[in-house]
């Protein structure tokens, strides 16, 4: 399994100066072993999410690749929207 962090997620973390490197690394290692480990989004088998330090990350599974494609603050109405192709 390969895990890809989308550029928009990287820029979101950098802009808000959110240090998650150690926790995100452990989550990525868990995703490589069991990609279906976290909760589904809207009953879609391949769209899932996890939360670290008040930031909700969404990812989807596409073949042998896991793409962390969006994120938002848990207690905020603002969201980062990404088109899925």
Predicted regions and their residues:
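Generic cytosolic/nucleocytoplasmic N-terminal low-complexity/intrinsically disordered segments
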Residues: 22, 45, 74-76
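Arg/Lys-rich, positively charged N-terminal/basic patches that mediate binding to nucleic acids
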Residues: 1-27
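Enriched for short, Lys/Arg-rich terminal
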Residues: 2, 51-56, 60-85
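Short histidine-centered beta-strand/loop micro-motifs
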Residues: 13-15, 40-42, 60
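Generic alpha-helical hydrophobic packing signal
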Residues: 4, 27, 32, 71-73
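A short, surface-exposed loop/turn module that caps and links secondary-structure elements
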Residues: 26-51
């Amino acid at each position: 399994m390969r895990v890809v962090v989308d550029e928009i997620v990287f820029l979101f973390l950098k802009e808000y100066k959110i240090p998650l490197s150690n926790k995100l690394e452990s989550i990525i290692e868990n995703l490589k072993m069991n990609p279906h480990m976290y909760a589904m989004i809207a009953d879609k088998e391949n769209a899932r999410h996890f939360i670290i330090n008040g930031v909700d990350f969404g990812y989807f599974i596409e073949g042998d690749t896991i793409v962390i494609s969006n994120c938002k603050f848990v207690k905020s109405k603002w969201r980062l929207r990404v088109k899925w192709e």
